[in-house]
UniProtKB/Swiss-Prot annotation:
InterPro entries: Ankyrin_rpt, Ankyrin_rpt-contain_sf, Espin/Espin-like. SUPFAM superfamilies: Ankyrin repeat. PANTHER family: ESPIN (PTHR24153), ESPIN-LIKE PROTEIN (PTHR24153:SF0). This is Espin-like protein. The keyword Repeat applies. GO terms for cellular component: cytoplasm; stereocilium tip. The gene is ESPNL. It comes from the Eukaryota. Interacts with MYO3A (via C-terminus). Interacts with MYO3B (via C-terminus). ANK repeats lie at residues 1-31, 35-64, 69-99, 103-132, 136-166, 170-200, 204-234, 238-267, 270-299. It comes from Homo sapiens. GO terms for molecular function: actin filament binding.
């Protein structure tokens, strides 16, 4: 109460009340408002000089007290034009003449900004510098140009005339700012009297004419075009002219005047005309003006959109209807009608193939017309392309998919399919280097050569999927080949990178199926050999004496898998000694994990056989299991170093020589292995210490079960990543690991989502065609397209693969409906806090509500969001925020983590916190203070079924409202995967990459 009374008394200049409060001992420097402004600030703003003197001299309050933004009472006096208070504060109150606040603003900046020429003159007379700059590079002259006060501008140009062409950090000159604010008299003074350069541009390429046209300052535009030599066709960095800016802002008089002055209609860098900009923003009058000046409404930009398309997409249906009506008399109507908007060939090909198998689109797969204007047309008709001369933007590229024979290309800047895609290259090397700490969890420095090994690991993994795709020869058909499956101690099962799950019963069942296939293959070979011998005997002996045939009816068949034509290599039984060999003091893995090596090698062939993709002549390279087990059972330092070199392209010897100066002679890089009995620290260079022996017979190049636990000595175990720094690991190590995990996780899904998938469809089509040509062999087996029907195990494995494939295809179909200009503008000029739904297709002319986002749509939007030019701190905190979202997904459900993400971004958007403040308090409010996530067990493990059932009642279902989900194509061709299924896959995939990161990064010796 006393605090509030003091603030009110200071504002009102009530010295008597302040005296009573002083006698009561209630006045002090701690009395401030919510912004940190004290009593002297409030008295100065109100212009009560006597109150200011009382507070400083009698109450002994500091006259130079600073608010939260660093402003002193002198700043308040300069902003309000209180000359007497400013003079007293500077001369007797302890304030500095050139004191700057947190943003670098001085009293002279504020006096010029608010148009107080008397204060400007006094400050300059007292010796205030006219060239003092803020953190943004603005001088007082720039502030005067914004204020519009000609006297202040003249005083400042007289004090320092060379500042007239000085630009800020964003490239704005005083003339640019005056034109942007519409101050014609200032622009005339700067150009005619001060010689300001009208051709100076901001960093985004905008000139003074562009700024005036964008803000709708008609008189300034006319004066600049008439009395200066500025060009009518001047473009900004994106190729936009003054016509584009005027049409975008709905400034019809400027648009009409520029057209009457002969300004040509030009396209921007992405093929958009001023009519596209006017229609996109719903400016009906501008559209009518442009059409009256003979601008063709049927022109398309590089994404294939007409102006009517953009108007319809953004919900301006009256504008879209008008543009379609005026386009009807155009002779272009003699050509076939346009295709549905937009018409990517990839989507059309996939839709035609799927409709052929299903007999037409079903209710779970709505046509793209639910997201876009409905046109009668042909879905597979290509779009006419206009010739563009401007290059594509550097931040956004588009993908083009080639012929259906399996080849594919990705041409930067080619947007013929309308598919807006992301840059698939990783972060700059400097950003990746910062994710690897310089000290381990014990505070010991990590050798720089070893740090560089880890940096190369992360770089190689972030680009692994692209290199695998480039090396693929056309036989790759699914996402399972992009990363090796691995045994998870957390889930007590085998996880795939997309969250696929294999349990003990699944492996036993697969082993039985593989054995049946091998037996069947041998029987077929014997059948062929017996038939050949019978033919020879019949040729040598008289026909009545010998009649030998082979009845194949009694040959064993693999039930449900007769379509498999590929030869499966025989798997030798694993040696019991090797399978049971365990490092001392280490808990052994389950016995059934000894079968993993041959099952993992055969899994891809088996699943491809289900899809009918394996050709009869395919001969997978075989490798004796005995050798594999022998290699995996002993992992000497030499093998580890060579594995690093082969997998990550890292030369340990070179790195160590580059980053570590030798005080003595270094031991050579011994090509032979270190002795198994050697101590850990005997080999000082050239190789790494020997790791504990693996617990199962896996190939040395594949992840070994149990490596995760042993490799994770970075202070964070594989089962959990603590939300806060523990005693062993500092906060930097914990946050760096979280960043690495989320980058690996999102990079894997992002690359898979934006890799052209037409090859998969083509391979399946060719496989089915070849199967049909086999004649009698194909007649003996059922058709390949149908999923396996015997038992739930093989069917659920097929369903896992199919679900992931259709999820990725669904993402491609959704992104085909996002105009590239929407992504460009969000990336170029973010307004407020960005959110994933802003990067998704509009529904009914508006972005999808955040509250209806499903998990897959959230991820799809986040892929695009992280491609924007974000500040370093915001990017880091968004990575950490994403980590917490996926970390708590399995325990709290999708809607809880979605609300948590929304709460954090809302706090930042409202200005109540900065990204640097973190979000630990909000996380504790949503998820509690427990640092160890209670991972759900797998109730389907014993039955061999993937956990695809509903979440516990405490968790809310993952999917949003059904209409929105259907409009965004969240149903697959298989017809049954839902939000809960996707949550399960994403949750397990996140666990997979957490353990993968722990295996890759080991900061111990």
């Amino acid at each position: 109460m006393e605090k509030q009374r003091a603030l009110v008394a200071a504002k009102d200049g009530d010295v008597a009340t302040l005296e009573r409060l002083l006698e009561a001992g209630a006045l002090g420097p701690g009395i401030t408002d919510a912004l940190g402004a004290g009593l002297v600030h409030h008295a100065t703003r109100a212009g009560h000089l006597d109150c200011v003197k009382f507070l400083v001299q009698r109450a002994q309050l500091p006259g130079n007290q600073r608010a939260h933004n660093g402003a002193t009472p002198a700043h308040d006096a300069a902003a309000t034009g209180s000359l007497a208070e400013l003079c007293w504060l500077v001369r007797e109150g302890g304030c500095g003449l050139q004191d700057q606040d947190a943003s670098g603003v001085s009293p002279l900046h504020l006096a010029a900004r608010f148009g107080h020429p008397v204060l400007v003159e006094w400050l300059l007379h007292e010796g205030h510098s006219a060239t003092l700059e803020t953190r943004e590079g603005a001088r007082p002259l720039h502030h005067a140009a914004v204020s519009g006060d000609l006297t202040c501008l003249k005083l400042l140009t007289a004090a320092h005339g060379s500042s007239v062409n000085r630009r800020t950090r964003s490239g704005a000159s005083p003339l640019y700012l005056a034109c942007q604010e519409g101050h014609l008299h200032l622009a005339q003074f700067l150009v005619k009297d001060c010689g300001a350069d009208v051709h100076l541009r901001a960093l985004d390429g905008m000139s003074a004419l562009h700024a005036a046209a964008a803000r709708g300052h008609y008189s300034l535009v006319v004066w600049l075009v008439t009395f200066t030599d500025i060009g009518l066709t001047a473009r900004d960095n994106e190729g936009a002219t003054a016509l584009h800016f005027a049409a975008r802002g709905g400034h019809t008089p400027i648009l009409d005047r520029l057209l009457l002055m002969g300004t040509p209609i030009l396209r921007d860098s992405w093929g958009g005309t001023p009519l596209h900009d006017a229609a996109e923003n719903g400016q009906m009058e501008c559209c009518q003006t442009l059409v009256s000046h003979h601008v063709d409404p049927s022109l398309r930009d590089e994404d294939g959109y007409t102006a009517a398309d953009l108007a319809e997409y953004h919900g301006h249906r009256d504008c879209a209807q008008y543009l379609r009506e005026v386009a009807q008399p155009v002779p272009l109507l003699m050509t076939p009608p346009p295709p549905p908007f937009p018409p990517p060939p990839l989507l059309a090909t996939r839709r035609s193939l799927e409709d052929g198998r299903r007999g037409g689109p079903g209710p779970g797969n709505p046509s793209p017309m639910s997201l876009s204007p409905a046109w009668p047309g042909h879905p597979d008709q290509p779009l006419p392309r206009e010739q563009m001369t401007s290059p594509a933007p550097p931040r956004i590229i588009t993908s083009a998919t080639a012929d259906p024979e399996g080849t594919e290309t990705a041409l930067a800047g080619d947007t013929s399919d309308g598919l807006a895609a992301l840059q698939l290259d990783g972060l700059p090397s400097g950003d990746i280097d910062g994710l690897v700490p310089t000290r381990d969890e014990r505070g010991q420095p990590i050798p720089e050569w070893k740090r560089q090994v880890m940096v190369r690991k992360l770089q190689a993994r972030l680009g692994a999927e692209s290199s695998a795709e480039a090396q693929d020869n056309g036989g790759s058909s699914g996402p399972t080949e992009q990363a090796a499956w691995r045994y998870s101690q957390t889930h007590q099962a085998i996880l795939g990178p997309f969250g696929e799950l294999l349990t003990e019963d699944d492996l036993v069942y697969l082993e039985k199926q593989i054995a049946d296939l091998q037996l069947r293959r041998r029987c077929q070979e014997y059948e062929s050999e017996l038939g050949r011998l019978a033919a020879e005997l019949q040729a040598l002996l008289p026909e009545p004496l010998v009649s030998i045939t082979v009845n194949s009816h009694f040959l064993p068949r693999a039930p449900g898998l007769e379509v498999e034509e590929a030869s499966i290599p025989a798997a030798e039984p694993a040696g019991s000694a090797e399978a049971s060999e365990v490092a001392p003091g280490v808990q052994p893995l389950p016995f059934w994990c000894s079968h993993i090596s041959r099952l993992v090698r055969s899994l891809s062939l088996l699943l491809k056989g289900v899809h009918g993709l394996v050709q009869g002549d395919e001969k997978p390279s075989t490798r004796p299991l005995q050798d594999t087990c022998r290699e995996a059972s002993a992992s000497p330092p030499r093998s580890e170093a060579q594995r690093q070199i082969q997998e990550w392209g890292v030369s340990v010897r070179t790195l160590r020589g580059n980053f570590e100066s030798a005080s003595g002679p270094l031991c050579g890089f011994n090509p032979g292995p270190c002795e198994p009995g050697a101590q850990h620290r005997q080999c000082l260079s050239g190789c790494w210490p020997a790791l504990p022996k693996p617990r199962s017979g896996l190939a040395s190049g594949e992840p070994r079960p149990g490596d995760t636990e042993e490799a994770s000595d970075s202070g964070i175990s594989c089962e959990e990543v603590p939300s806060e720094a523990g005693a062993a690991a500092g906060p930097d190590l914990a946050s760096l690991r979280k960043e690495r995990i989320i980058m690996l996780f999102l990079s894997h899904w992002r690359r898979s989502a934006y890799t052209p998938a037409l090859k998969t469809v083509a391979c399946r089509t060719l496989g089915a065609r070849h199967a049909g040509l086999r004649g009698q062999e194909a007649a003996r087996s059922p058709g390949p397209p149908s999923p396996p029907s015997e038992g739930p195990r093989l069917g659920h494995l097929w369903q896992q693969r199919s679900t992931i494939t259709h999820l990725l295809g669904n993402w491609k179909a959704i992104m085909a409906h996002v105009p590239a200009r929407q992504l460009r503008r969000l990336s170029r000029q973010p307004r407020g806090a960005l959110s994933p739904e802003q990067f998704l297709p509009h529904v009914d002319g508006a972005p999808v509500p955040y509250s209806s986002l499903s998990l897959d749509l959230f991820m799809l939007g986040y892929f695009q969001l992280l491609e924007c030019d974000l500040p370093a701190e915001e990017r880091k905190l968004r990575h950490l925020l994403c980590f917490e979202v996926f970390e708590h997904l399995g325990t709290h459900g999708w809607e809880a983590v979605r609300a948590f993400h929304k709460a954090v971004t809302d706090e930042v958007a409202a200005g109540r916190r900065a990204w640097t403040d973190g979000f630990e308090d909000i996380k504790a409010r949503f998820f509690g203070s427990s640092q160890r996530p209670a991972w759900d067990t797998e109730p389907g493990r014993k039955s061999g079924l993937t956990l695809l059932g509903p979440l516990p009642h405490a968790a809310v279902p993952c999917s949003g409202p059904e209409p929105t989900a259907q409009r965004l194509g969240s149903r697959s061709q298989q017809g049954s995967f839902n939000g809960e299924d996707i949550c399960g896959y994403i949750n397990r995939s996140f666990a997979f990459w957490k353990e993968k990161e722990a295996e890759m990064f080991n900061f111990g010796e």
